[in-house]
Amino acid sequence: MALLFLCLIFGTGRTQKIEAADTETDQAAAAQDELLAELDFDAIQQEVDSLLSSQQFSFAGTVRSLLQDGDPFRTFRAGNAVLSCAKTAFLAQKGLMKELFLFVLAGAVLGSFSSLFEGKQVRDASFYMVYLLALALILKNFQSSGENLKAVITSLVAFMRILTPSYYLAAAAAGGASSAVMFYQMLLLVILAVEKLLLALVLPMIHIYLLIALVNDLSGEEILSHMTELLETCVNGLLKSSLGVLVGMQMIRNLIAPALDSLRQMALWRTAEMIPGIGNAVNAVTELVAGSAVLIRNCFGVTAMLVLLAAGMVPAVQLLVSGLSFRLLAAAAQPVSDKRIAGCLAAAGKGYAMLLRLLLTVEVLFLLTIAILAGTFS
């Protein structure tokens, strides 16, 4: 009888613990659903559909999936996507590379035949003909790549603008009012820097750099070499400075804002504990809601980061393939063709590298802005 009584006591205690755990799970799920209902996923999804027109991506569905299993890489498989993008970019550049390779061969053949004639007129005429045709093709392709890059960055800025109010609300609900304000202010500053500095100044400087580099190779006397070096230094300096300054400002402010939020949360919980009779219950519910809000905020941020990565992956791979193609063609042309043609191709490859660096700078700025906020109270 005594043994049966002990079994009933322990069995009842375990049942109560299980019921309490189930109740807490239900309360957490209810709190998550209530917080998710306050977020505007429709406007975000419209911008995601515009940004990822060739991919099917559900923003709200990904957030809910992360809330359940917490694995962001289950919905984002980058390996096959990168290979597919590289293959598509290579096929897109294949025609241009064939034409430029034919121009390189034509320049080499014409240069060999022109050496049989007296004087430099025939050789110079053949060189200028080939060089100007190659220059026209390079500038046309580079202009198209620059316009595509500008459209991608503009779409990324529009996505971050739509994302900001909902992410601000999620961060504020997580008990991080000061952190949410910091995020809002810093994101506006990052968007301003991207639009007014990177798009309005750095991108045109890259185009000017390539044009001057091509003209410099055309003259053959290096009369504009210092100008190209100056532009390259300015572009690289502006990209590095913008990244360092903006990220540094966020890191410094992130040392203060989370501490203020933590102090306010602690004061609120201590006040709730002092309420007679229901203090512990209120404190438990408050901690549950705060934990759910932090989880939603971080899942929301990770989903936004996945969208940014998916949106920037295709143009980044395209620019990388284009730059490598021009560099390889320049290396192949140097032994058989005029050094100015090889220099022209190498300058185009360097221009594509600058475009890629610009895109990566924008991506890193947005990703770190989200990651710094998501890292608080994690």
Residue spans for each PLM region:
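Small-residue-enriched core segments of transmembrane alpha-helices in multipass membrane transport
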Residues: 125-135, 156-165, 193-199, 230-244, ...
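Mid-bilayer segments of alpha-helical transmembrane spans in multi-pass integral membrane proteins
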Residues: 129-141, 160-177, 197-205, 209, ...
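Helical hairpin unit composed of two closely spaced alpha helices linked by a short loop
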Residues: 298-339
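Generic multipass alpha-helical transmembrane bundles of integral membrane proteins
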Residues: 183-306
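Gly/Ser-rich, low-complexity
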Residues: 4, 8-104, 108-127, 141-156, ...
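Membrane interface segments of multi-pass transport proteins and intramembrane proteases
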Residues: 115-120, 154, 219-235, 333-342
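Interfacial loop-to-transmembrane junctions
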Residues: 336-356
